[in-house]
């Protein structure tokens, strides 16, 4: 799928606008109850993501003669509000820092969010962490403020089997650890 220069400009503008916000500790986002982290956890990191959601045209698991765009993985750069690199986000889902620490999440809550043309908002639990760094204390992760990233609207047919679509998206990820 060809990249869309208009979307690239919009995503860049969104990141630039948030980069100018006041610094200091991030405030927890307002989210529906299903996306609240468990009691006893405190927000410690906000990461702004810009990248793609990767889909593959594949047979449906329960109807192999019918095809659909199946989600495969995210691929995104993570930055703070000042635009400094915090790492990358990829399949797992995994968030990895240049300091070698990483966290792998599993979805625990989902909400469609306010924009039907964007991927849903999520609450994830940390399934595992590795390394000793920024992501090591993570217990929960929220994905909110999503823009775009949904599966292509074009039909997925047998003729397009195994075709890959890389759909641009942005999101904010909030990381929680055990409260002190």
Q: Regions from the language model: what does each represent?
A:
Residues 17-20:
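C-terminal motif of bacterial Sec signal peptides marking the signal peptidase cleavage site
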Residues 25-54, 61-180:
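Primary mode marks residue(s) on the alpha4-beta5-alpha5 output face of response regulator receiver
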Residues 12-15:
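Extended, amphipathic alpha-helical scaffolds
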Residues 1-10:
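Bacterial N-terminal signal peptides that target proteins for export
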């Amino acid at each position: 799928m060809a990249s869309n220069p208009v979307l690239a400009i919009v995503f860049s503008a969104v990141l630039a606008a948030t980069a100018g916000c006041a610094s200091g500790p991030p405030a927890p986002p307002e989210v529906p109850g299903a996306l609240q982290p468990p009691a006893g956890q405190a927000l410690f990191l906000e990461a702004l993501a810009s990248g793609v959601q990767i889909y593959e045209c594949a047979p449906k698991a329960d109807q192999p003669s019918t095809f659909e765009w199946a989600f495969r993985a995210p691929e995104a750069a993570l930055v703070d509000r000042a635009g400094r690199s915090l790492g990358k986000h990829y399949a797992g889902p995994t968030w990895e820092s240049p300091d070698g620490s990483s966290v792998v999440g599993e979805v625990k809550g989902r909400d469609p969010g306010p924009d039907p043309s964007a991927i849903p908002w999520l609450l994830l639990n940390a399934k595992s962490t590795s390394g000793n760094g920024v992501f090591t204390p993570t217990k929960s992760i929220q994905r909110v403020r999503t823009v775009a990233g949904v599966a292509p609207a074009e039909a997925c047919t047998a003729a397009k089997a195994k075709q890959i679509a890389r759909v641009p998206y942005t999101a904010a990820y909030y990381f929680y650890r055990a409260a002190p």
